[in-house]
């Protein structure tokens, strides 16, 4: 099983629409670990996803649409070396 790590920036109407909580649920359902947080610009959500490549891809596919009420305008994915550093999936404070 190939493991993967993606550093993701999702832009658009993605704050105030339960994006972080929804992403956490989707990630946990797919066995993906990492974190998600809002950025202080008010229009960006940032996440790091780690897990089996197929599972990470499922979360990324979901993130292109997001939860009801979201309007994703752009998604930037930076593939990084898998580190296996997370035990679960967390919602972190805004930066």
Curated annotation (Swiss-Prot):
GO terms for MF: acylphosphatase activity
Catalytic function, reaction form: an acyl phosphate + H2O = a carboxylate + phosphate + H(+)
Active site: 20, 38
UniProt KW keywords: Hydrolase
InterPro entries: Acylphosphatase, Acylphosphatase-like_dom, Acylphosphatase-like_dom_sf, Acylphosphatase_CS
Keyword Hydrolase annotated: yes
SUPFAM superfamilies given in the database record: Acylphosphatase/BLUF domain-like (SSF54975)
Pfam families: Acylphosphatase
Ranges of residues in domain Acylphosphatase-like: 5-93
Enzyme superclass (EC): hydrolase
Gene3D superfamilies: 3.30.70.100
EC number(s) stated in the UniProt entry for this protein: 3.6.1.7
Keyword Transmembrane helix: no
PANTHER family: ACYLPHOSPHATASE (PTHR47268:SF4)
Family to which this protein belongs: Belongs to the acylphosphatase family.
Name of the featured protein: Acylphosphatase
């Amino acid at each position: 099983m190939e493991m993967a790590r993606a550093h993701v920036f999702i832009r658009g109407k993605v704050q105030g629409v339960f994006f972080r909580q929804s992403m956490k649920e989707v990630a946990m359902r797919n066995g993906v670990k990492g974190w998600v947080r809002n950025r202080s610009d008010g229009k960006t959500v940032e996440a790091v996803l780690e897990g089996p490549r197929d599972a990470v891809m499922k979360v990324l596919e979901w993130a292109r649409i997001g939860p009801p009420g979201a309007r994703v305008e752009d998604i930037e994915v930076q593939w990084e070396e898998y580190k296996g550093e997370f035990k679960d999936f967390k919602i972190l404070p805004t930066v």
